[in-house]
């Protein structure tokens, strides 16, 4: 402790000495300055003159020297600017590094002074060296400051340039800025230049490698983004409708963000009241969960680096997780009506506060207006703020719990999109005239596109963009059909999937019963099949879609749930196991292939009862003729043989699974009700049941073995002989197939198992896509001309037959009455 006190006292003494020495040096420097006689010599009250008080070196007469006249470089002086620099840097937090440097300089100066203690007899040369060092450091600091200021100014100028380039007027007056943007856009993306997208959006377009906008995107963007109109859009499937409404939404959000940034630079924190941060800006409603997730994925890809959050709200997932994501306050929400209304009715704050909602989108709107579907949509529409008389620029005070917000009231834009939108001529005229009010249905149901648009708050002078052609179908899709009996549909389906099993294929069914029947048969026949229908859980749905996307030659058997908007790449073939109930559903089914300028094939399996429906369907699309899908009937016996075994196996397994399900159901409910099941079977019956089970299992095993042997060999045509064939008649294709077959057998012997699906399926025929087979051999066509007369004859004969049956039944009833009367009278 004593030594510590001594050291502290010594340090104090040294500091005092250094301060004294510093003062003396300053006085000496001041005394050595040349003085001017700017002030006359006078005397004060005590009689002393100013010259005696402020006497210089004796070289010049006395007087004051103004600070402007002092040049510190001439006198080797440095002005004490350290404190002022520190205060300036405290105001600007970006210059923390400079403040640290100045503090280090101060510490170094003190250390240098401490080291110099005890050297009272030091020469003036050392002082000059330290001064020079300090001057050099001060100059360095000034240069660093200048460089940092230049960098800041450059950043500000660049930001201003970007803002000026993005804030292009809606009327297109700034031609110079457009030229600058066109020069910056790469030549392969030059088609986007006319749309005047925000620079950040253009970066997303480059990253996604979209070379040019689609027709619907180009037509909708200028109308929606720059003119601010509501849009009713219709275009063929796979035409990019998601970005047609997604790009205007992102463009407006980015423009508003820049405007708020400019206001913040002018007005400071007052500009925050003009921002709508933390509120829902766009609400997109889709009919299916899969479509909602797909739209979310597309928008997230487009808004990846834009700091715009997109959240899906769909059923089949935990609502708690979705509520957590809504607490992040996303700008865009993509939802299905059921789960959206569930969260809205529960009072979810982010979904209920819709005063800042700028966009309301209905995707696949024609599906939402079907009778009996989406009753929640009516309740959602009732919650939307009224937009009958929008006043742009006026502010609206909104009470939110404890705070009162001044939010700018803006026009809400409504987008209605689908591949098939049928608007009546009266409704089109009504929209053009601008009469917003119309007669709604007495029940209040949303049962048409017209009512849906009006209830959603569609404003006057709406833009109707209808890019559908008379055929409505995609231009590169090729239609075909196979005429067959109802029992033969399974055989022809298996023929297409095995003989032409290349590329992704979707098989559409009208019922879940048909779906389970087909998937069960095809799985027994060794095909890797995915299923998708509404009764599946959401996790199983997503797994099924992922499996289908992962397989290049995948097969998806689905109901019309998949027909709406789902975008799966490289779907080559669509098979209609049964025709849909409406032409709109047929369009959406076919729209899963031939998407985004690609080609595809559609095959319809037509039974006799569906011929008239198919004719009317083709005529509604203005088809002059339809190709008949080419079939090689020499392979059909082998197909039928395999299918016969598969059906027997399927029926046995189905019967057994039903019995087990019934047994477990009885046991479960008996246990829950605390009841004992009566075992009425005798021992003989039990023995018979055991024998029957053993016999069925033995038969099942035998059928499975027989089918596995057939599946282990490639499918052969009827006339082909595996034992005797002339060497001259063997083609090069067949020779290559035999070599490949030998390799497969060797691989099977090494593995010791059964290869589930083989590359070599058919002898003497290449495994090609159905589209290639259709182009190669589909010359036979069914012409639609002249079918109307045949159809009329069929209808007339059918009416005549029904009339005759009706007359016969009536005569029979009369005869029966007469007989009863005779019996009663006798």
Swiss-Prot record:
EC class (word): hydrolase
SUPFAM superfamilies reported for this sequence: P-loop containing nucleoside triphosphate hydrolases (SSF52540)
Compositional bias (Acidic residues): 94-128
Motif (Q motif): 190-218
Record field: compositional bias (Basic residues): 11-22, 133-154, 815-826
UniProt KW Hydrolase keyword: yes
Coiled-coil intervals: 125-166, 666-712, 783-810
EC number of the protein: 3.6.4.13
UniProt catalytic activity: ATP + H2O = ADP + phosphate + H(+)
Positions that bind ATP: 235-242
Chain residue ranges for the region called Disordered: 1-62, 76-175, 783-826
Keyword Zinc included in the entry's annotation: no
A single MF term (Gene Ontology): RNA binding
Protein family according to the UniProt entry: Belongs to the DEAD box helicase family. DDX24/MAK5 subfamily.
PANTHER family: ATP-DEPENDENT RNA HELICASE DBPA, ATP-DEPENDENT RNA HELICASE RHLE-RELATED
Protein's name in the database: DEAD-box ATP-dependent RNA helicase 13
Species this chain originates from: Arabidopsis thaliana
Species lineage: Eukaryota, Viridiplantae, Streptophyta, Embryophyta, Tracheophyta
Gene (UniProt): RH13
């Amino acid at each position: 402790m004593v030594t510590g006190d001594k050291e502290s006292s010594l340090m104090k003494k040294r500091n005092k000495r250094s301060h004294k020495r510093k003062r003396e040096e300053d006085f000496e420097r001041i005394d050595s300055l040349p003085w001017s006689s700017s002030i006359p010599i006078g005397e004060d009250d005590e009689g002393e003159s100013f010259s005696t008080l402020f006497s210089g070196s004796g070289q010049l007469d006395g007087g004051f020297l103004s600070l402007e006249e002092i040049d510190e470089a001439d006198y080797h002086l440095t002005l004490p600017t350290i404190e002022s620099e520190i205060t300036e840097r405290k105001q600007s937090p970006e210059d923390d590094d400079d403040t640290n440097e100045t503090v280090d300089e101060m510490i170094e100066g003190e250390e240098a002074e401490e080291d110099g203690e005890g050297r009272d007899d030091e020469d003036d040369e050392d002082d000059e060296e330290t001064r020079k060092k300090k001057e050099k450091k001060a100059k360095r600091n000034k240069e660093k400051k200048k460089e940092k200021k230049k960098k800041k100014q450059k950043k500000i100028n660049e930001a201003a340039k970007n803002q000026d380039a993005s804030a292009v007027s809606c009327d297109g007056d700034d031609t110079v800025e457009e030229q600058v943007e066109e020069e910056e856009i790469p030549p392969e993306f030059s088609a986007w230049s006319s749309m005047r997208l925000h620079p950040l959006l253009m970066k997303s377009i480059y990253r996604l490698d979209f070379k040019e906008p689609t027709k619907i995107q180009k037509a909708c963007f200028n109308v929606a983004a720059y003119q601010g109109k509501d849009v009713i859009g219709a275009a063929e499937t796979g035409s990019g409708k998601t970005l047609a409404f997604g790009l205007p939404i992102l463009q407006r959000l980015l423009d508003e963000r820049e405007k708020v940034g400019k206001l913040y630079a002018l007005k400071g924190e007052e500009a925050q009241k003009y921002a709508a941060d933390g509120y829902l800006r766009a609400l997109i409603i889709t009919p299916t969960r899969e479509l909602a997730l797909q739209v979310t994925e597309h928008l997230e890809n487009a808004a990846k680096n834009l700091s715009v959050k997109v959240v899906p709200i769909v059923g089949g997932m935990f609502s708690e997780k979705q509520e957590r994501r809504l607490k992040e306050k996303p700008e865009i929400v993509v939802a299905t009506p059921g789960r959206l209304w569930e969260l809205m009715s529960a009072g979810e704050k982010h979904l209920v506060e819709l005063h800042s909602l700028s966009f309301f989108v209905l995707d696949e709107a024609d599906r939402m207006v079907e009778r009996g579907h989406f009753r929640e949509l009516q309740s959602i529409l009732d919650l939307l703020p009224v937009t009958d008389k929008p006043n742009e620029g006026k502010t609206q005070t909104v009470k939110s719990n404890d705070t009162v917000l001044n939010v700018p009231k803006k026009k809400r834009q409504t987008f209605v999109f689908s591949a098939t939108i049928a608007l009546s001529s009266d409704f089109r005229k009504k929209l053009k005239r601008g009469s917003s009010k119309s007669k709604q249905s007495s029940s209040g149901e949303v049962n048409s596109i017209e009512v849906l648009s009006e209830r959603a708050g569609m404003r006057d002078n709406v833009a109707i963009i209808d890019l559908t052609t008379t055929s409505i179908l995609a231009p590169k899709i090729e239609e075909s059909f196979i005429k067959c009996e109802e029992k033969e549909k399974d055989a022809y389906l298996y023929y297409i999937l095995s003989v032409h099993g290349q590329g992704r294929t979707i098989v559409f069914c009208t019922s879940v019963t048909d779906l389970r029947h087909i998937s069960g048969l095809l799985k027994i026949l060794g095909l890797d099949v995915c299923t998708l229908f509404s009764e599946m859980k959401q996790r199983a749905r997503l797994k099924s879609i992922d499996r289908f996307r992962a397989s290049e030659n995948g097969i998806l058997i689905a109901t019309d749930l998949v027909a709406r908007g789902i975008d799966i790449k490289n779907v080559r073939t669509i098979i209609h196991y049964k025709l849909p109930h409406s032409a709109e559903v047929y369009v959406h089914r076919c729209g899963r292939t031939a998407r985004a300028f690609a080609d595809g094939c559609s095959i319809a399996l037509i039974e006799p009862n569906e011929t008239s429906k198919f004719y009317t369907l083709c005529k509604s699309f203005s088809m002059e003729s339809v190709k008949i899908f080419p079939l090689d009937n020499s392979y059909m016996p082998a197909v039928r043989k395999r299918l016969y075994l598969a059906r027997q196996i399927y029926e046995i397994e189905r019967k057994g699974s039903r019995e087990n399900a019934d047994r477990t159901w009885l046991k479960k409910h008996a246990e829950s009700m605390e009841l004992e099941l009566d075992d009425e079977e005798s021992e003989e019956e039990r023995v018979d049941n055991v024998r029957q089970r053993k016999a069925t299992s033995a038969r099942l095993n035998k059928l499975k073995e027989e089918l596995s042997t057939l599946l282990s060999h490639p499918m052969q045509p009827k006339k082909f002989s595996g034992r005797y064939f002339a060497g001259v008649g063997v083609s090069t294709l067949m020779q290559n197939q035999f070599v490949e077959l030998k390799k497969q057998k060797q691989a099977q012997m090494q593995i010791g198992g059964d290869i589930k699906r083989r590359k070599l399926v058919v002898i003497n025929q290449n495994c090609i896509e159905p589209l290639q087979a259709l182009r190669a051999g589909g010359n036979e066509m069914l012409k639609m001309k002249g079918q109307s007369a045949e159809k009329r004859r069929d209808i007339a004969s059918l009416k005549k037959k029904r009339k005759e049956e009706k007359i016969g039944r009536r005569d029979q009833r009369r005869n029966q009455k007469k007989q009863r009367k005779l019996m009663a009278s006798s």
